[in-house]
Amino acid sequence: GIRYIVAGAYAIYEHTGIYRKTKDLDLLFEPASVVPAARALRDAGFVTRLEDAHWLAKATHGEYFVDLIYGMGNGIAVIDEGWISHSHPGILAGTPVRIAPAEELIWHRLFISERHRHDMSDIVHLILCLGDAIDWDRLVARVGQNWPLLLSQVLMFGYVYPGYRKNIPEWV
């Protein structure tokens, strides 16, 4: 089979218990798996298209929308083995799936900050709900030279949830 992990609103729900309606299903693939995944969806009756060559394909079938994500919108990284190896099991619509790891979800969401979309609430809720279960070493390594983005979210977390500062190690 084609390896994938579930991200988006469902992954946030799995990690935090916070439910929100979503218009689509976000599936993450290593780049080499996107074309086979798109073909499989096309064979299942979906219409598929390449949306952005460096990170995103889409599949639609009536009222069903699937994002096939294989990189970051800003082009700094692709979905790699780290996403898959640190994913964990879950159940979606009665089907066993792998859920994107919280650390990579935070890393990915650090770069989503536009006028019409900003994922800060997902980041602070992941920190609130998972706290010291987050592999902060891995997250900081993933963020790398973009550490000011993580710092801004750590500061915002402290502002929004001042009683939960212990959820973030002091060294961060």
Regions found by a protein language model. Give the residues of each.
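Compositionally biased terminal segments of proteins
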Residues: 1-172
